[in-house]
From Swiss-Prot:
Family recorded in the similarity comment: Belongs to the adenoviridae E19 family.
Record PTM: Both disulfide bonds are absolutely critical for the interaction with MHC antigens. N-glycosylated; high-mannose.
Protein name: Early E3 18.5 kDa glycoprotein
Function, in words: Binds and retains class I heavy chains in the endoplasmic reticulum during the early period of virus infection, thereby impairing their transport to the cell surface. Also delays the expression of class I alleles that it cannot affect by direct retention. Binds transporters associated with antigen processing (TAP) and acts as a tapasin inhibitor, preventing class I/TAP association. In consequence, infected cells are masked for immune recognition by cytotoxic T-lymphocytes.
Glycosylation site positions: 29, 78
Compartments it resides in: Host endoplasmic reticulum membrane
Secretion signal, residue range per the UniProt entry: 1-17
Pfam assignment, any one: Adeno_GP19K
Disulfide bonds: 28-45, 39-100
Amino acid sequence: MRYMILGLLALAAVCSAAKKVEFKEPACNVTFKSEANECTTLIKCTTEHEKLIIRHKDKIGKYAVYAIWQPGDTNDYNVTVFQGENRKTFMYKFPFYEMCDITMYMSKQYKLWPPQKCLENTGTFCSTALLITALALVCTLLYLKYKSRRSFIDEKKMP
């Protein structure tokens, strides 16, 4: 009788352990961009589980969240992973302030692309390219013209 009770307890323990779901931590990627003098962030996450939800500031999204970061905003975001009826929340901290500071500094430092005055920059580029092409064409034609004359004169001089 004692072995029968131990067997039932062991079977119950195995069954309860089989129901437990193991959650793998989602892989998240945070990118930054400077748009209209604001630092925008994009958080993308992938997982092997059925579904996930990302929460950052007041934004909620499935697999991705796009938000505008401003000084004073929180550095936290969380990802909730679902598997059947079970779920688990992973908490993350990210240095948004430092990354946005670098992103904004670099965008102000190097105003090379995209052009701010598109028409002027494009017109200048096209004019310069046309001038260089014309100069190269004139030089090539002059070289060919005088080279053929020299070779013709050299042929006449030969006995």
